């Protein structure tokens, strides 16, 4: 068995399988694409649709919009112990079907459940940020999780769905299921 160190994780390649196995030995860096693929294979990252080949980047995972955008009055976080789905039900003004593409209006705030969800072990956490193309379009977007008290942060051991807050600033935008506005880095 060949053993190497990468980003604070022990990498052991099983003889003959060619598949890297990852076991946390520290939390000192961002996971590479091979580790992200292993997390998908092992079920720590799941999705309602299969991942696409170009979705896994060298050190991040592009996150995809789900089927519905919920228009809300303002930005919010659920807070510790609170569920985003319940907050969405409480604060939704109306919903927008994204399956065929829909316009998200400038100056409005939307919450979109993402296709991906996580079942992270206690050794893994994550951070998120908008993709650079999203910023160039002047679309403000942040990641939210159940129980979050901070945007764009996923606590170690998080199990649950992921949501994007989207607020087009300069122009209204056309959004559809599968569009990628955020990316996530696991550590």
Region roles according to the model:
Residues 1-187:
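Non-catalytic terminal segments and appended small domains
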